[in-house]
């Protein structure tokens, strides 16, 4: 009778271990993406503050591939604001994904603890 219980617990532990490793990798990836998006957001903000100090009639060029396109100050300003907004939205999504992954691992650990407590009670 003890052998099936041991096999069941062993299987549950191996599944938990695989899930924890997979989740840790996904959380690390999300952290890296969040850091990169924060850098992008900061870069866009700093560029925008520099641009806003210039006179409205200043010629500005946007780099596209290997060429530069003449743009108005307002067009570049709106592009930078949009870039910041998109980065903030993606950061929020990644943080939600990260918290979901951490919750799912905790729930799996709690389920195994409950299974162990039930086995000890028998």
Curated annotation (Swiss-Prot):
Keywords annotated in UniProt: Acetylation, Chaperone
Modified residues (N-acetylalanine): 2
GO molecular function: amyloid-beta binding; protein folding chaperone; unfolded protein binding
One Pfam family matching this protein: Prefoldin_2
Stored SUPFAM superfamilies: Prefoldin (SSF46579)
Keyword Chaperone on entry: yes
Alphabetical GO biological process terms: chaperone-mediated protein folding; negative regulation of amyloid fibril formation; protein folding
GO terms under cellular component: cytoplasm; prefoldin complex
Organism domain of life: Eukaryota
Coiled coil residues, start to end: none
SUBUNIT field: Heterohexamer of two PFD-alpha type and four PFD-beta type subunits.
Functional description taken from the UniProt entry: Binds specifically to cytosolic chaperonin (c-CPN) and transfers target proteins to it. Binds to nascent polypeptide chain and promotes folding in an environment in which there are many competing pathways for nonnative proteins.
Family label: Belongs to the prefoldin subunit beta family.
Protein name, entry field: Prefoldin subunit 1
Organism from which the protein derives: Homo sapiens (Human)
Gene: PFDN1
């Amino acid at each position: 009778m003890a052998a099936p219980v041991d096999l069941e617990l062993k299987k549950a532990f191996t599944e938990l271990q695989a899930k924890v490793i997979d989740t840790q990798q996904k959380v690390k990836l999300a952290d890296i993406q969040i850091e990169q998006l924060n850098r992008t957001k900061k870069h866009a903000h700093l560029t925008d503050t520099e641009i806003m100090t210039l006179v409205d009639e200043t010629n500005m060029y946007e780099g596209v591939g290997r060429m530069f396109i003449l743009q108005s100050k307002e067009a570049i300003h709106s592009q930078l604001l949009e870039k910041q907004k998109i980065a903030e939205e993606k950061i929020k999504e990644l943080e939600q994904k990260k918290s979901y992954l951490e919750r799912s691992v905790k729930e799996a650990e709690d389920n195994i603890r409950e299974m162990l407590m039930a086995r000890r009670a028998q």
